[in-house]
Amino acid sequence: MNHGISILFRAIPLAMAAFCFAYGAYIFAAGTDAARLTAGPVVFYLGSICIALYCTAATIIRQIIGTYTAAAKYLFPAIGYTFAVLTLISGAFIIASHWPGALVTGHVVCGLGLITACVATAATSSTRFSLIPKNSADDSFSVNPAGFTRAESSLLIFIVSAIAAIAWVWCILLYVRGTLPAHIVAGSVMFGIACVCTSLIALVASIARQARGSYTMAEKGKWTGLVLTMGSLAFVLGLILIFAYWDHPINFVGFVLIGLALICWSISSKVILLAKIWHADFPLANRIPIIPVLTALACLFLAAFLYEEAAFQAKSFVPARVLSGFGAICFTLYSIVSILESGTSKK
């Protein structure tokens, strides 16, 4: 990877973060109706995920081009976790406020904080990314002493698993204890967020275990299957909600779930790439980055249709804006998988 390309792949997450922050703030400031007070903060805090993805990108790229320092090893994960905490605090503040739509908005923003924490954990697991090509070329399948210890690898996987478990419990509580349509909306979105967090377990586990050299051939299908299943669950529930509540104002949440499914499938590109190149040559590895490009386009095309629909049905206002933000997330994931492909290439 040359210096110019390394700058480009680090600029993409920052550009997408700037888009989310600016667009979210614009939506929020342009009115006081519930739709804007919901879509604005959600799109804004999607920027936190982009920042955490930037930290992952910078961590890997600096190792590839030889500019990784001891300070960077701690700085980038710390930035990711800081944005995660700030997002969670903001979500809690919104829940406690009394503005229109605060219940849904606050819970969703908290969920975005959970995703940001998972991505920050992926950045942490990437601090020894440079060992993956070496371990992949080792035919003895032995553990690399320079990689993570068993305890460190297990801790990273535990952290992201615990965050995913929190998201699932949060989702269940919203469904079970909720009495308002808003609880159905918030619970459904949290379901999709839990699917994304669970998908990130596969990414963190793949990176951490390959960096340690303990990744097995059996895990290739295991982690890939987990991510694809999570995306499918979110997609199917999204379709069910769209048609089950067709004449109700809350069926818009189905489109949000479809967007979260597309994010899961974007994450799958990284998990698939790591699986395909482990102790194997995969000539089509440089084609895998097409996956998040396609999911980003799908988000944007769906958002375009919903923008038109919003002129006739107000319930389409929120998903149209949120899907635009999801498109930014998917495009950011394109830069990450491209970096992974470059860093693991045997050329």
Predicted regions located by residue number:
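Short, Lys/Arg-rich N-terminal segment immediately upstream of the first membrane anchor
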Residues: 1-8, 143-151, 217-218, 283-285
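Alpha-helical transmembrane segments and immediately adjacent membrane-interfacial amphipathic helices
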Residues: 6-29, 40-63, 75-97, 103-131, ...
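Short juxtamembrane and helix-loop transition motifs at transmembrane-helix boundaries
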Residues: 2, 66-72, 211-220
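Short, charged juxtamembrane terminal tails flanking transmembrane helices
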Residues: 1-3, 135-139, 340-347
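Membrane-interfacial, low-structure loops and terminal tails that flank and connect transmembrane helices
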Residues: 132-148, 215, 280
